[in-house]
Regions:
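Generic secretory/membrane-interface signal
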Residues: 23-24, 36-39, 71, 166, ...
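A generic alpha-helix propensity feature with a strong bias for hydrophobic helices
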Residues: 60, 110, 273-275
């Protein structure tokens, strides 16, 4: 099958399914529809239309449907990273352009856009990172991965961004997320994730981050909401606004740098609270 024919058939399939979705119940069925579309489109991951591998072209109507459906699914389950990813890609065009321009205006960010590094297990020297002294950025990042039982390979590839350079900016944001957890001293429990989202919302302006920052607190208990509102939230927003563009840092060349020194360079204050990775409970620093 020729490449244009394959793409046309895929788009027609998307449009037909989107028309079917609009005729059903709005909220419950749109989440189901976007999951159905996403599964159907996954088979096109290996397709290369000339923009970048795995790109899936969509028109504005299809993007809107995907945005609404993935948003509903993400609200129902914030740990549905595939739905969060679709929401970010279908709503973030303007914010991605701003982030791209900030990276272009920074020498280190420009180098990143030119060299296109990836943060994956295949690109990390875990043995070397484990040998670094405590307090170094690389050692603390590895400790974060171990303590929270996460892996950089869990970040899915971008599919729905219709610009190759902006697609990389989104991918870089996605792969830098766990590094931000390390920089901010936040675990991956709900309180830690919401605090990071408040930082990201102020730093990136991505609609997905703003939505997560606004709605994430609704999933917190009263005891966990109090430290967010009185301490973690204001700290996260303030630092998100004042920090250097976090996408413009070549973290792969900073593993040996001390975490404290890197925070100072980025103009990020140490967290006001210590949150244990094994518990949702926040405790004040002594």
């Amino acid at each position: 099958m020729s490449q244009p024919t394959h793409t046309s058939q895929m788009l027609r399939s998307l449009l037909v399914s989107s028309r079917r979705c609009t005729g059903r119940g709005l909220f419950m069925d749109e989440a189901a529809c976007v999951r159905q579309q996403h599964r159907g489109l996954d088979s096109a991951d290996s397709h290369y239309d000339g923009l970048y591998p795995g790109h899936i072209p969509t028109n504005p109507i299809q993007k809107a449907l995907l945005a609404v459906g993935s948003g509903v699914a993400a609200l129902q389950d914030p740990y549905r990273h595939d739905m969060v990813a679709v929401l970010g890609e279908t709503t973030g065009h303007l914010a991605l352009m701003t982030l791209r321009d900030r990276m272009r205006g920074d020498p280190e960010g420009y180098t990143i856009l030119t060299e296109r590094p990836r943060i994956r297990l295949s690109t990390l020297d875990l043995s070397k990172m484990a040998s670094l002294p405590d307090g170094s950025f690389g050692r603390e990042y590895l400790r974060f991965l171990e303590d929270n039982r996460v892996t950089p390979d869990s970040r899915v590839n971008v599919k729905f961004v219709d610009n190759e350079e902006l697609a990389y900016v989104m991918q870089r944001y996605r792969e830098v997320h766990d590094l931000l957890h390390t920089l901010l001293g936040m675990p991956t429990n709900m309180l830690g994730e919401v605090a990071v989202k408040w930082f990201e919302a102020a730093q990136t302006g991505l609609p997905m981050c703003i939505l997560g920052a606004a709605l994430g607190p609704l999933r917190l208990s009263t005891s966990r909401l109090e430290p967010l509102v009185t301490s973690l939230g204001p700290w996260a927003v303030r630092n998100g606004r004042q920090a250097r563009c976090v996408l413009s840092i070549f973290y792969e060349r900073r593993w040996e740098q001390s975490l404290e020194n890197l925070r100072e360079e980025l103009n990020i204050e140490p967290p006001p609270l210590t949150i244990r990775a094994t518990s949702q409970k926040a405790t004040l620093d002594s």
